[in-house]
């Protein structure tokens, strides 16, 4: 790859959309699937057959059915090296809210969730809306004691069960209730609906920002607090069975207050079948209470292990969240963690280490935010001052390159190109995976915090404000 920089201002045409509001009825719940999202089987060749017409021979439908493409959140799409990129379409203008969630793909459709509490299925090839389902009225910012999203609707990235053809999303509904919906990916019809606020939680101060994890017939849902840390909130993980059986599973972070699980990658699944989350600061400074920690949970949400830095009390008192980035799962089960302090920690998958028991640690950047991407032993780390490539060995890691002066959104990798949005400039930038040199750049509209692209074979998607952009990879 040469170091050319391609700048494109994407011009969009207005598309008028009509919106319908669905009534809240408990409908038949789809059968449970033992398969985690990400399997290539089960995605239909066409959503709403007869409506879709392909206009580009360069785009092949593919499946990116959960945050960063798989349950370990690697964010890597293997493909031939990228030799060129061009904008395919931008639209549909008229999305009824901002896009914080990562777009997902299945079959010929890309699925977009909005803060207007709607899910859209959009044709991968031409950007036409295949269907739209509105799930209710979002919660206005004026109804919340603090926060920076207005209105608040669907914030966490949904998950698709390809075996049942169902997309699951948590909608925050006015006047203040979190509801897990299951929708048919074929036509957007509502298949299931369940309230997923944990017993004793106050929905008005619990934010569902982290990505959903679907595994073995359970949707795992992380919660943190609102921007401003107002109210008596705790971090939670709630589990809802897709077949509707039993009561909700739940794990409350045992803090006096705070300790939110708010990293956008949400819950990660390890090769051992256990779940990994990272928490933000709590108010504790004398007795450890699982604030600023990495926690390993069983599928039934029992605590199995944990790690916290030796300076956890200082991190707590300074609002220096370890959980500003979700855990990165290595192929052998080891865990990499970084937070606002910018210090990376390598943890053993067989024993996370308790307080101060890391295998290795080193300062990497000014502060990590969002979700990482991983290609083999290499991790791409989003920081507020740089995008950093870290290479992990058996018991340590080292920095391979650092793209400084880049306010990095959560990266993904397609072939030999690392893609990330510069949050400060609203540019989508492609970096050479080996060297860290910028190769491509595209100007977007305004973007939201922690935004991340998604990919399918030959195509890249990114949400910006209330817009979806598509790029063809050659």
Descriptions of predicted regions:
Residues 25-474:
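Noncatalytic, solvent-exposed loop/strand surfaces
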Residues 1-33:
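Secretory targeting signatures
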């Amino acid at each position: 790859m040469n170091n050319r920089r391609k700048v494109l201002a994407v011009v969009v045409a207005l598309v008028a959309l009509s919106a319908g509001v669905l009534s809240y009825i408990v409908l038949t719940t789809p059968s449970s699937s033992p398969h985690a999202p990400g399997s290539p089987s089960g995605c239909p060749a066409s959503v709403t057959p007869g409506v879709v017409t392909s206009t580009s021979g360069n785009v092949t439908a593919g499946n990116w059915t959960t945050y960063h493409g798989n349950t370990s959140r690697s964010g890597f799409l293997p493909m031939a090296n990228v030799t060129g990129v061009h904008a395919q379409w931008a639209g549909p203008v008229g999305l009824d809210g901002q896009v914080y969630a990562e777009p997902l793909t299945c079959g010929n459709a890309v699925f977009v969730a909005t803060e207007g509490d709607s899910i859209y299925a959009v044709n991968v090839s031409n950007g036409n809306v295949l269907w739209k389902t509105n799930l209710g009225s979002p919660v206005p910012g004026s109804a919340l004691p603090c926060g920076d999203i207005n209105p608040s609707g669907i914030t966490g990235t949904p998950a698709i069960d390809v075996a049942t053809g169902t997309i699951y999303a948590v909608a925050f509904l006015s006047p203040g209730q979190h509801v897990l919906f299951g929708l048919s990916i074929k036509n957007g019809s509502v298949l299931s609906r369940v309230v997923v606020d944990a017993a004793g939680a106050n929905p008005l101060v619990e934010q569902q920002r982290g990505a959903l994890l679907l595994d073995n017939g359970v949707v795992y849902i992380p919660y943190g607090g609102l921007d401003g840390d107002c109210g008596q909130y705790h971090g939670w993980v709630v589990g809802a069975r897709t077949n509707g059986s039993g009561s909700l599973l739940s794990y409350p972070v045992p803090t006096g207050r705070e300790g939110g699980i708010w990293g956008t990658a949400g819950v990660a699944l390890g090769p051992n079948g256990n779940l990994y989350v990272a928490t933000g600061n709590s108010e504790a400074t004398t007795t450890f209470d699982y604030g600023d920690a990495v926690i390993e949970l069983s599928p039934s949400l029992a605590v199995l292990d944990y790690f916290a830095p030796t300076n956890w009390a200082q991190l707590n008192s300074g609002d220096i969240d370890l959980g500003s980035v979700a855990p990165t799962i290595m192929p052998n089960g080891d865990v990499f963690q970084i937070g606002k302090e910018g210090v990376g920690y390598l943890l053993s998958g067989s024993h996370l280490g308790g307080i101060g028991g890391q295998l290795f640690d080193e300062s990497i950047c000014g502060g990590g935010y969002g979700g990482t991407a991983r290609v083999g032993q290499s991790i791409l780390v989003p920081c507020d001052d740089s995008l950093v490539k870290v290479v992990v060995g058996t018991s340590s890691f080292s920095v391979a390159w650092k793209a400084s002066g880049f306010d990095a959104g959560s990266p993904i990798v397609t072939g030999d190109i690392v893609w990330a949005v510069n949050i400060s400039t609203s540019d989508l930038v492609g970096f050479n995976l080996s060297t860290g040199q910028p190769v491509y750049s595209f100007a977007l509209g305004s973007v939201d915090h922690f935004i991340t692209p998604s990919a399918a074979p030959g195509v890249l998607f990114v949400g910006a404000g209330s817009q979806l952009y598509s790029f063809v990879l050659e």
